[in-house]
Structures are given as structure tokens and as C-alpha cells.
Design a protein with these regions (language model features):
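N-terminal glycine-rich, Lys/His-bearing helix-loop that initiates the first secondary-structure elements
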Residues: 1-47
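Conserved N-terminal alpha-helix of the aminotransferase class I/II PLP-enzyme fold
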Residues: 35-79
Length: 79
């Protein structure tokens, strides 16, 4: 894939229901946990997931994956 294509589409798979190709903006600051153990596992980094929007959120996750793909890396970190 060309870098221009990766810059626009990398790190995101279109929603299967809506077929939307634009990355959604999640207007939330907190995420629900399945139970207390799930919350503990998230904070201990035992499982991947969203905890709090300043730490990780789906929109930043796409940015990190997209930049990593453009640079040939395995991961990224948006600060």
C-alpha cells in the first residue's frame, strides 16, 4: 500500500454495519467495565481495552496504529 493510502485508511477497518470509512469520534471520558476484575485487569495491562480517555480511547488507537503503519513500526503512542 502507498503511504498516502495508509495515511488515510491505515489502522482502521470500516464499520461492518454502516460501512463508514471515517474514524468515529467518541465523546466520552470513561468506559464501563464488565466487573471489578475486568477493571483491575485493564489497569494492570493484562487485557487490552479502554480505561479513561486521557489514557486510551478508540480514536487515538487508530491514530497510533496509522502512524505506526506509515513508519513500518509495530505500535505507536500518541501523547
Amino acid at each position: 500500500m502507498k503511504i498516502e493510502t495508509i495515511a488515510v485508511h491505515g489502522g482502521y477497518t470500516p464499520d461492518p454495519t454502516t460501512k463508514a470509512v471515517a474514524v468515529p469520534i467518541y465523546q466520552t471520558v470513561a468506559y464501563a467495565f464488565d466487573n471489578t476484575q475486568h477493571g483491575a485487569d485493564l489497569f494492570d495491562l493484562k487485557v487490552a481495552g479502554n480505561i479513561y480517555s486521557r489514557i486510551m480511547n478508540p480514536t487515538n488507537g487508530v491514530l497510533e496504529a496509522r502512524v505506526a503503519a506509515m513508519e513500518g513500526g509495530v505500535g505507536g503512542l500518541a501523547v
